[in-house]
Swiss-Prot record:
One of its GO terms (cellular component) is cytosol. Belongs to the TACO1 family. The lineage of its organism: Bacteria, Pseudomonadati, Pseudomonadota, Alphaproteobacteria, Hyphomicrobiales. Pfam families: TACO1_YebC_N, Transcrip_reg. This is Probable transcriptional regulatory protein BCAN_A1755.
Length: 248
């Protein structure tokens, strides 16, 4: 396990689930609203909206919240969000990609830059680190979905490219453009997924010691807590020994 998956796991162990969940619903709602504004409010005719709704449902977001986010796109509340990607280097030289939906580019850029600077990292130009990542689809299932063989068979039939199974569940990867079809086929075989989204997958990882890892985790936590930030991706990894210390 590496990068953001480890970060999520550590935050889960530290008991931040409720706070993270509340903020997650807010960010999912923003993605739904933006998707609905950019296309038709009908998920059957809007692939991005369909994916956003699928992911929201997978995260147990209430139906009323989803419908409210869609209706908000049709309103004249003056909220228009720009999609912005930031790239930079964190402590230990790790690569970091930040995706944001913002109604104030200056505010978001200032906050993101400050987070990098305070952590000892630096914000770079767009494209400065993304070439070291691949854009792919990620579908996650809980362990209860089935054993490794069952999930592997379903993933192959669905057209997925890779499957990683472990005690925490199953992570299925597919081509970026195939995520809609693959997730639909997997749902028919395995039921509803725990999450469905597109991610930046690092081509190689940078292993960190405990000190540098703590600094990176602090940076990721600050970025995740920013209301404008939707997703954060990085290529760090730590040993099992360091992981246990960070989770304590």
């Amino acid at each position: 396990m590496a990068g953001h998956s480890q970060f999520k796991n550590i935050m889960h162990r530290k008991g931040r689930q409720d706070a993270v969940r509340s903020k997650m619903f807010s960010k999912l709602a923003r993605e739904i609203t933006v998707a609905a504004k950019q296309g038709l409010p009908d998920p059957a005719m809007n692939p991005r909206l369909r994916l956003a709704i699928q992911n929201a449902k997978a995260q147990s977001m209430p139906k009323d919240n989803i419908e409210r986010a869609i209706k908000k796109a049709a309103g004249n509340d003056g909220e228009n969000y720009d999609e912005v990607r930031y790239e930079g280097r964190g402590p230990g030289g790790v690569s970091v990609i930040v995706e944001a939906l913002t109604d104030n580019r200056n505010r978001t850029a200032s906050n993101v830059r400050a987070a990098f600077t305070k952590s000892g990292g630096s914000l770079g130009e767009t494209g400065s680190v993304s070439f070291m990542f691949d854009r792919v689809g990620e579908i996650v299932y809980k362990p209860e979905a089935g054993d490794a063989d069952k999930v592997m068979e379903a993933a192959i039939e669905a057209g997925a490219e890779d499957v990683q199974s472990g005690e925490d569940g199953h992570v299925i990867l597919c081509a970026f453009e195939d995520i809609g079809e693959v997730s639909k086929a997997l749902e028919a075989a395995l039921g509803e997924a725990e999450s469905i989204k597109t991610i930046w997958k690092p081509q190689t990882n940078t292993e960190l010691d405990e000190e540098k890892a703590r600094s990176v985790l602090k940076l990721l936590s600050v970025l995740e807590d920013d209301d404008d930030v939707q997703n954060v991706y990085t290529n760090f990894e730590v040993s099992d020994e360091v992981m246990e210390k960070l989770s304590a």
